[in-house]
UniProtKB/Swiss-Prot annotation:
<dbReference type="GO" id="GO:0061631">
    <property type="term" value="F:ubiquitin conjugating enzyme activity"/>
</dbReference>
<dbReference type="InterPro" id="IPR006575">
    <property type="entry name" value="RWD_dom"/>
</dbReference>
<feature type="region of interest" description="Disordered">
    <location>
        <begin position="123"/>
        <end position="174"/>
    </location>
</feature>
<dbReference type="GO" id="GO:0004842">
    <property type="term" value="F:ubiquitin-protein transferase activity"/>
</dbReference>
<comment type="similarity">
    <text>Belongs to the ubiquitin-conjugating enzyme family.</text>
</comment>
<protein>
    <recommendedName>
        <fullName>Ubiquitin-conjugating enzyme E2 Q2</fullName>
        <ecNumber>2.3.2.23</ecNumber>
    </recommendedName>
</protein>
<keyword id="KW-0547">Nucleotide-binding</keyword>
<keyword id="KW-0067">ATP-binding</keyword>
<keyword id="KW-0832">Ubl conjugation</keyword>
<feature type="active site" description="Glycyl thioester intermediate">
    <location>
        <position position="304"/>
    </location>
</feature>
<keyword id="KW-0963">Cytoplasm</keyword>
<comment type="function">
    <text>Accepts ubiquitin from the E1 complex and catalyzes its covalent attachment to other proteins. In vitro catalyzes 'Lys-48'-linked polyubiquitination.</text>
</comment>
<dbReference type="GO" id="GO:0005524">
    <property type="term" value="F:ATP binding"/>
</dbReference>
<comment type="pathway">
    <text>Protein modification; protein ubiquitination.</text>
</comment>
<dbReference type="InterPro" id="IPR050113">
    <property type="entry name" value="Ub_conjugating_enzyme"/>
</dbReference>
<dbReference type="InterPro" id="IPR016135">
    <property type="entry name" value="UBQ-conjugating_enzyme/RWD"/>
</dbReference>
<feature type="compositionally biased region" description="Acidic residues">
    <location>
        <begin position="136"/>
        <end position="153"/>
    </location>
</feature>
Length: 375
């Protein structure tokens, strides 16, 4: 689809579901992203509204050949199920039809009547006064030509004048040049793999992981060195994460200082591996080094954390929030470095075995949820 065609479609959607719509609102949009809200009346009080349900949509570079990717800021399994069914619905990749299906499903989920405005999504895109499609300015034509020459730059593309919220920052703003170069390298590699018929992963997972990586590169926690991220063999699905700063008052912090003096290592190295169905399944996370005791670290380096299981995972979780939660959990669980321990005891096969065993136990007996004051 051309840039002007995509813009016309997004404008059409935003004109129907504007920021004041009673049921579904498109709060902001760009050529590769939609931020939406679904409003659910409070039970027994139609005039009292709980916080709206927030949905995000990533529009891929190959749209409409490939489907947009939807995810939701909620841990409700019913909502996750709705999005999974949408992912399985391959009949129509057009945003208009996906939006219609999604709104109808959400209305059904919350026992609400189907909103009449969804029928407007079946209409063709509006035409100009002379019966032609909206006129494209020479400036837009020039932009479209640039897009055709270098389509992988779509992630950088921004039309500030079309955005409902003025002053919206570019998705690459706040990212250092060396990290932008990494993102660009990934995009070019993915494009080349696609041309060579050697695509790895899924469009859904790759788009979400690119978004996660951009958010990390932009975050203050990353920039201040609390943690770092490195892609293993340039793979978007295999990360090394270094926890470089932990609570300075913790025994773990003291151990890391000693480890630095002895071995020149002052961090905890984690491995994050992602599957094709991310973000609907959690990443598999394990400690690579150093060998730790306590801190909910299992044999092989796996982590005993509910949020890293299907039972406790939500597609709305960001990877940075997972990293920071692991950091806090290690400290809270009184993790200590095992100096002189056999480093070979941490490996992927053993970690997966420990993880599977602990998941089976907790599926039968449940998980312990600490009081809120314990974090």
């Amino acid at each position: 689809m051309s840039v002007s065609g995509l813009k016309a479609e997004l404008k059409f959607l935003a004109s129907i579901f504007d920021k004041n719509h009673e049921r579904f609102r498109i709060v902001s949009w760009k050529l590769d992203e939609l931020h939406c809200q679904f409003l659910v009346p409070q039970q027994g009080s139609p005039h009292s509204l709980p916080p709206p349900l927030t949905l995000h949509c990533n529009i891929t570079e190959s749209y409409p050949s490939s489907s947009p990717i939807w995810f939701v800021d909620s841990e409700d399994p019913n909502l996750t199920s709705v999005l999974e069914r949408l992912e399985d619905t391959k009949n129509n990749n057009l945003l208009r039809q996906q939006l219609k299906w999604l709104i109808c499903e959400l209305c059904s989920l919350y026992n609400l009547p189907k909103h009449l405005d969804v029928e407007m999504l079946d209409q063709p895109l509006p035409t100009g006064q002379n019966g032609t499609t909206e006129e494209v300015t020479s400036e837009e034509e020039e932009e479209e030509e640039e897009m055709a020459e270098d389509i992988e730059d779509l992630d950088h593309y921004e039309m500030k004048e079309e955005e409902p919220i003025s002053g919206k920052k570019s998705e690459d703003e706040g990212i250092e040049k060396e990290n932008l170069a990494i993102l660009e390298k990934i995009r070019k590699t993915q494009r080349q793999d696609h041309l060579n018929g050697a695509v790895s992963g899924s469009v859904q997972a790759s788009d979400r992981l690119m978004k996660e990586l951009r958010d990390i590169y932009r975050s203050q926690s990353y920039k201040t060195g609390i943690y770092s991220v490195e892609l293993i063999n340039d793979s978007l699905y295999d990360w090394h994460v270094k926890l470089q700063k932990v609570d300075p008052d913790s025994p773990l912090h003291s151990d890391l200082q000693i480890l630095k003096e002895k071995e020149g290592i002052e961090y905890i190295l984690l491995n994050f591996s992602f599957k094709d169905n991310f973000p609907f399944d959690p990443p598999f996370v394990r400690v690579v080094l150093p060998v730790l005791s306590g801190g909910y670290v299992l044999g092989g380096g796996a982590l005993c954390m509910e949020l890293l299981t299907k039972q406790g995972w939500s597609s709305a979780y960001s990877i940075e929030s997972v990293i920071m939660q692991i950091n806090a959990t290690l400290v809270k669980g009184k993790a200590r470095v095992q100096f002189g321990a056999n480093k070979n005891q941490y490996n992927l096969a053993r970690a997966q075995q420990s993880y599977n065993s602990i998941v089976q136990i907790h599926e039968k007996n449940g998980w312990y949820t600490p009081p809120k004051e314990d974090g």
